[in-house]
A protein has these predicted regions:
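Unchanged
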Residues: 61-84, 92-153
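Conserved Nudix-box catalytic region and its N-terminal flanking loop in Nudix hydrolases
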Residues: 38-78
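Conserved positions in beta-strands of structured domains
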Residues: 35-37, 86-89
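Acidic, metal-coordinating catalytic segment for phosphate/diphosphate chemistry
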Residues: 2-33
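Nudix hydrolase/Nudix homology domain
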Residues: 52-53, 130-186
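Conserved beta-strand residues within beta-sheet cores
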Residues: 31-33, 82-85
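A generic fold-level signal
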Residues: 24-29, 38, 48, 107-109, ...
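Active-site beta-strand termini and strand-to-loop segments that position acidic
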Residues: 36-39, 117
Length: 186
């Protein structure tokens, strides 16, 4: 088998040369969030040093890192707790026009995976050790109060993920809005 020359035919079946095909693809960031609740059904939100709005635990996916690995890493870095991540609650496409990003970042848009971090009891909550310099603290917030505590798209995403957890079905979102109706509750 021969390898096509650089810039030659694309071995993946398109009529475009490989370089042109690669350049035509969308460039997006990949991020993760983790939905953690307490036994009263309140959602863990972080007070961070770099924004006024609160956030779910999470962050960016590093190069060559799987989203589940990134979620586990972020929970450990931000909360000091080791957590196995496996269940996806939501996948959200965040447009490049989302307000709040410094123009210097050249924000291209983002795909954010929201994972289920489980329901934590008092012992798990007591083990939280917020990362100094980044996380000022954490609070468990009633779901109805999320829109007042978070940026609009983040609140919509968190609430959609919470709904997905209770209906046993992941949801696909665009800018925090479900693109299909959620499955019926069982």
């Amino acid at each position: 088998m021969t390898t096509p020359p650089p810039g030659g035919p694309n071995p993946h079946g398109t009529a475009m040369p490989a370089a042109a095909y690669g350049a035509s693809r969308a460039t997006l960031w990949t991020g993760v969030s983790v939905l953690i609740t307490d036994t009263a059904g309140r959602i863990l939100l972080q007070r961070v040093t770099y924004r006024t709005a609160r956030l779910l635990p999470g962050g960016g996916v590093d190069p060559k890192e799987a989203p589940t690995e990134a979620a586990a890493r972020e929970v450990f870095e931000e909360l000091g707790v080791r957590l196995r991540i496996s269940w996806t609650l939501a996948v959200d496409w965040v447009p490049s026009t989302t307000p709040g990003f410094d123009p210097g970042t050249c924000f291209p848009g983002e795909i954010i995976y929201v994972f289920d971090g489980g329901t934590w009891d008092g012992e798990q909550i007591a083990a939280i050790r917020p990362r100094q310099g980044e996380i000022e603290g954490v609070d468990f917030v009633d779901p109805v109060d999320l829109p007042a505590q978070m940026a609009p798209g983040n609140a919509r995403r968190a609430l959609a993920a919470l709904h997905a957890r209770t209906t046993d079905g992941a949801v696909t979102l665009e800018d925090g809005y479900p693109i299909t109706p959620p499955p019926p509750a069982s």
